[in-house]
């Protein structure tokens, strides 16, 4: 069930299940609304960056996909833009140099670049100080556990989720049948011997 739930969530997000992406219709937004969370931090951490303008922040461990992110800067160098919200634009490691040097795509008074550096850490690139980093994201769904598990056995244990107690699907009930159908199909596929195709 857990694998089916994860598959359905990812398919709804990227549009493979319905042909529309997660925020395109009210129906799709409702299916995943229980997984949408907001996180903000003012705690910059140490890190070795790709540029002299790098700032590092931790992000939550339950992130599946970031759907929106912004920063707030009160840097005096911003002039009248001081205290304004700046959008954050993700870039790949390969794109960073040419994007950073492009005056229309690089970081500026309205835009900050983001690199994913692993270990639930992001590198934000801005020549201005960053006072607050905020994200809205789709979180990983908690595993579906149909019965309490025997001692010592856990599924998806985290600091906030014990992983050994009965836990039903927390998603919108309208999507439960789809998750069940995917789970049945996965179970059937796992029992059918491979024909070598």
Please give the residue ranges for each predicted region.
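Glycine-enriched, solvent-exposed interface loops adjoining structured elements
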Residues: 1-197
């Amino acid at each position: 069930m857990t694998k089916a739930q994860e598959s359905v969530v990812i398919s709804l997000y990227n549009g493979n299940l319905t042909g529309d992406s997660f925020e395109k219709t009210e129906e799709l937004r409702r299916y995943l609304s229980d997984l949408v969370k907001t996180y903000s931090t003012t705690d910059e951490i140490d890190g070795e960056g790709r540029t002299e303008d790098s700032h590092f922040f931790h992000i939550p461990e339950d992130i599946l996909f970031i759907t929106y992110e912004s920063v707030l800067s009160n840097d005096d160098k911003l002039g009248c833009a001081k205290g304004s919200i700046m959008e954050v634009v993700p870039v790949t490691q390969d794109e960073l140099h040419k994007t950073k040097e492009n005056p229309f795509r690089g970081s500026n008074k309205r835009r900050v670049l983001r690199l994913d550096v692993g270990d639930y850490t992001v590198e934000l690139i801005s020549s201005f100080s960053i006072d607050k980093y905020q994200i809205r994201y789709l979180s990983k769904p908690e595993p579906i556990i149909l019965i309490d598990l025997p001692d010592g056995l856990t599924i998806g244990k985290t600091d906030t989720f014990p992983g050994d107690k009965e836990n039903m699907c927390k998603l919108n009930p309208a999507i439960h049948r789809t998750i069940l159908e995917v789970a049945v199909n996965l179970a059937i596929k796992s029992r059918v011997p491979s024909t070598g195709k």
